[in-house]
């Protein structure tokens, strides 16, 4: 359980809606492409309505202030998808260490579990502790050029190491690191300008209305639970 999971949830009933098609998406969707159990392609690109409204403003502002577009990497995840991706990440980490294990024995390797949980929320079916993406309030975003091509940010989305920390390059003074840090700063500044909160371990992960957002903004409760 994360520290922000202590925040109570009072879901305000905001609807889960499709993200407008004029925003840029990563295609093909990375998890759907891996076989994650989405109901169908229409259920992939969705968020809570207020989150979508804020995201549109972010994209418009970003375009007006820079040469970049916002590129949406991932959005709402049904719990089944969160479970699929969490298990996959755990088993891949086991393979790297030449450990042959079934997911049912996950607690036998607490160090691997701890590493995975730093980047992937546990797929809890307890409504008090929903994974951020399963609330419809969290999304993963990158910068792209005007043609939708990914801009280098210093690590890949979902890369499970220290380079994914939002501030990893802040004190590294080579030319590439300075560029990557400035791009991460730009993304964070614009997302937070429109009310989003950034995940402490992931430069790409932002949310509005979930428990992480409530914790970072010192709110009494979260606005969104599992949906």
Q: Each PLM stretch: what is its role?
A:
Residues 1-75, 79-200, 213-227:
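Extracytoplasmic cell-surface/polysaccharide-interacting catalytic and binding patches
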Residues 206:
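Conserved metal-phosphate-binding beta-hairpin within the catalytic cores
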């Amino acid at each position: 359980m994360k520290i922000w999971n202590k925040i109570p949830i009072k879901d305000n009933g905001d609807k889960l809606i499709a993200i407008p098609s004029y925003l840029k998406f990563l295609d093909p969707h990375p998890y759907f492409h891996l076989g994650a159990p989405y109901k169908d392609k229409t259920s992939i690109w969705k968020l809570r309505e207020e989150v979508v409204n804020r995201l549109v403003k972010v994209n418009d502002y970003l375009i007006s202030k820079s040469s970049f577009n916002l590129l949406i990497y991932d959005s709402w995840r049904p719990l089944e998808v969160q479970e699929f991706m969490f298990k996959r990440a755990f088993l891949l980490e086991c393979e790297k260490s030449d450990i042959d294990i079934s997911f049912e024995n996950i607690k036998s390797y607490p160090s691997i579990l701890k590493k995975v949980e730093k980047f992937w929320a546990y797929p809890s079916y307890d409504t008090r502790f929903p994974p951020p993406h399963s609330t419809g309030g969290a999304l993963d975003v990158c910068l792209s050029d005007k043609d939708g091509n990914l801009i280098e940010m210093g690590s890949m989305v979902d890369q499970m190491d220290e380079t994914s920390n939002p501030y990893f390059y802040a004190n590294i003074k080579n030319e590439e690191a300075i560029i990557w840090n400035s791009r991460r700063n730009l993304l964070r500044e614009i997302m937070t300008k429109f009310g989003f909160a950034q995940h402490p371990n992931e430069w790409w992960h932002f949310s509005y209305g979930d428990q992480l957002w409530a914790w970072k903004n010192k709110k009494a409760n979260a606005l969104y639970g599992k949906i």
